[in-house]
Amino acid sequence: MKHPLLRPWLTEKSTGLTEKKGQYVFVVKPDADKTDIRNAVEKKFGVTVKSVRTVNCLGKAKRQQTRKGLIAGKKSDWKKAVITLADGQSIDYYSGSAQKGEG
């Protein structure tokens, strides 16, 4: 698969995971599997991936009131991956590079 990583998922919860456990969260393509995600992270950031966990998230149901009545729809389903790196390694989301800790 070509480029399964779409973007980092930056929330309070994901930032806490990064600070406490060294885990990083990415939004990935829905048809990406764990080996594709692992290979993409290792290639893009030059780090060693310890584990990959994925979650399929269902899109929210949306409704909109118009003159003709209620229009029902749904946002697209999406997938996120929680990636654990080897000890002493980190990823800088903003520069797109990896950093290795001392020790």
UniProtKB/Swiss-Prot annotation:
Pfam families: Ribosomal_L23. Gene3D superfamilies: 3.30.70.330. One of its GO terms (biological process) is translation. SUPFAM superfamilies: Ribosomal proteins S24e, L23 and L15e. Keywords: Ribonucleoprotein, Ribosomal protein, RNA-binding, rRNA-binding. One of its GO terms (molecular function) is rRNA binding. One of its GO terms (cellular component) is ribosome. One of the early assembly proteins it binds 23S rRNA. One of the proteins that surrounds the polypeptide exit tunnel on the outside of the ribosome. Forms the main docking site for trigger factor binding to the ribosome. Belongs to the universal ribosomal protein uL23 family. Part of the 50S ribosomal subunit. Contacts protein L29, and trigger factor when it is bound to the ribosome. This is Large ribosomal subunit protein uL23. It comes from Chlorobium limicola (strain DSM 245 / NBRC 103803 / 6330). The gene is rplW.
